[in-house]
Amino acid sequence: MKGGLSPQNMVGLDTSSPPVIFVVGTAGAGKSSLVTSFQRWSRFLETEAIAVNLDPGAERVHYDAEFDVRDIISLTEVMNEYDLGPNGAQILAADLVAAQALDVADELHALSGELIIVDTPGQVELFAFREASSHLIEVLGQDQAAIIYLFDPMLSRSPSGFVSQMLLSSIVEFRLGLPTKNFLSKSDLLEEEELEKILEWSERLEILELALYDEAGGQRTEFAINQLRMMQQFSQSPGLTPLSSETEDGMADVLTFAQASVSYTHLTLPTN
């Protein structure tokens, strides 16, 4: 590791550094696809987005990663050296990356771009519930970081599946302490009626409550409704924004959220 860096000198605390957007969600929610599509979309608008891969278990990515954790951590080597299975190796790999957090921050902030978008590990718990992630966020600059949480569209079609994702998103926001906005990933896969229903659930709590009672009822529903009401009181970014990596719907919303959420004054949407 490089020496001579005190917390006061960390690049992440320099407000001239670009914002860092962590893309978080359950396995298969479309995190890598979003990073790929957002990078392509931003280049078309001549807005440079720096793509970062923090998933050591990714077999391949389709975006141009300016930093790829697989260049410094080999999951296979970790498994062999420490006699671990895939899950244990993923956890240890996250800790090994965190141990090099200052070097990672130096490398990222030496790059020229207007936004850093980070593809996190496939399993949400590997990013959200490890101290290594909190340390990495702190080094990169907590005041300049935010989270995009992706809802899986298939799971969102049922009231209980939708509420489960709302709860998980809130837990991630609470755990990492970053501004968080929810996006409905792969919205192009849904029928128009399904999409409208899900968006209505996200905007009108009373409609979601009725749907929960129709689906199940009982104590489980009462518990979910109580949690939802509490979440509604404290939510900083209510609602759900449709997002599609195929049609590029919602990409401008991602950029606008980044602009509004972090201490960075030079990031703007193109006017033409």
Protein language model features and the residues they cover:
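Conserved beta-strand segments of the P-loop GTPase G domain that flank and frequently precede/overlap
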Residues: 23-24, 53, 117-120, 147-154, ...
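Conserved GTPase G-domain signal focused on the G5
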Residues: 247-258
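The conserved Walker
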Residues: 27
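Conserved small/polar residues in nucleotide/adenosyl-binding loops
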Residues: 265-271
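Conserved catalytic-core segment of NTP-binding enzymes
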Residues: 125-226, 231-232
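Conserved glycine(s) of the Walker
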Residues: 30
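Nucleotide-state-sensitive switch-loop elements of NTP-binding domains
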Residues: 3-24, 33-36, 40-117, 123-127, ...
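Intrinsic disorder/low-complexity signal
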Residues: 1-20, 192-194, 199-202, 208-209, ...
